[in-house]
Amino acid sequence: MRKYQARIISIILAMIFIMFWDYLFYFIGKNPINWPVDIVYTAVTLVSVWMLAYYIDEKQQLVKKMKDNEWKYKQLSEEKNRIMDNLQEIVFQTNAKGEITYLNQAWASITGFSISECMGTMYNDYFIKEKHVADHINTQIQNKASSGMFTAKYVTKNGTIFWGEVHYKLYYDRDDQFTGSLGTMSDITERKEAEDELIEINERLARESQKLSITSELAAGIAHEVRNPLTSVSGFLQIMKTQYPDRKDYFDIIFSEIKRIDLVLSELLLLAKPQAITFKTHQLNEILKQVTTLLDTNAILSNIVIEKNFKETDGCMINGDENQLKQVFINIIKNGIEAMPKGGVVTISTAKTASHAVISVKDEGNGMPQEKLKQIGKPFYSTKEKGTGLGLPICLRILKEHDGELKIESEAGKGSVFQVVLPLKSDS
């Protein structure tokens, strides 16, 4: 009914006016009734009033629609601003000159500049103008590109520099003239620092790998060159030993040291020039039993008891080179035995996870302080007086080739635990 309100009211008022006029003209004025003129006059008046009222109704409806649309637009605008202000990314808009025309609240949070002080300023005033960035933007506009991305260093209000990744859209008019841009910017400082750190680590590893390769070649050459004359010296000393029986003790010391030098050279060659690995499937417990049987005599002579508990890995199969894996376990168990010169217990136990076997070797020795623990595994570093410092580096290399790892827990005065972690053979 509201859309006909003006017409209804106008017609009622017009009818009242006509009736009042007729009353004055015919009854009060005593004029004769002229029906044709009266009917035409009444009809023209009602139609005119109806048309005028129709225009008023339409205008009122149009005004109402405009107010409704204005209210809806205001609601949408407020909703859009709420959404934009809750975004973690900066949203910006610029005109053809590059002046900022819109910013969301994230701009203030990230850069420290208030939105009001930045409106109308040049967007590129807030990042470091590197040539590749400027060239990229100019090329995009010249090529009429619709969108793109670049990274740049931004400067906050307090002078802090951070990395920003910008994704933008470019807009043009009908004449292909640039009219402005709309985009988002994310703070990628942590990601950029991680990428730079990864690049630096890779470069450092590449340099170290090259150094190790050269060092390995050099070590292998030195080992061969030393071993050859050492063999000759040993042979001549054997002859001299028979000629000087009263100097037997001296010769025994010399031969003991030659044997030690030969052991160091052997381990150095093994570390520098590893042999080809033959991977086969083996029962883990069988390898451990063979190693402990081999070392039982050595342990007894050192007043050491070897306690074994392999139940957790019964039937567990691993892929690897049997001899190299035995070498790992022999080195680690011997370290445990040598860590207790006054005797004690070496405990060897196993456990397994869904994908790995864990072999633990625990001794009751003096343990190691943290500063020494950090050095363990470096070539020629040994905590033992007569150690070569090559046993653990060899173990680490072998385990790496078997996709395994070595974990060491030690505390001064409380002994050490060496854990060998090896992948189990897949059932597939």
Swiss-Prot record:
UniProt KW Membrane keyword: yes
A GO cellular-component term linked to this record: membrane raft
Domain Histidine kinase: 221-426
Pfam short name (any one): HisKA
GO biological process: regulation of DNA-templated transcription; sporulation resulting in formation of a cellular spore
Main location per the UniProt record: membrane
Molecular function GO labels: ATP binding; phosphorelay sensor kinase activity
UniProt topology in membrane: Multi-pass membrane protein
InterPro entries: HATPase_C_sf, His_kinase_dom, HisK_dim/P_dom, HisK_dim/P_sf, PAC, PAS, PAS-assoc_C, PAS-like_dom_sf
Places the protein is found: Cell membrane; Membrane raft
Record note on quaternary structure: Oligomerizes, probably forms homodimers; oligomerization is assisted by FloT. Interacts with FloT. Another study shows only rare colocalization with FloT or FloA membrane assemblies. KinC membrane assemblies are more mobile than FloT membrane assemblies.
Protein's name in the database: Sporulation kinase C
Encoding gene, per UniProt annotation: kinC
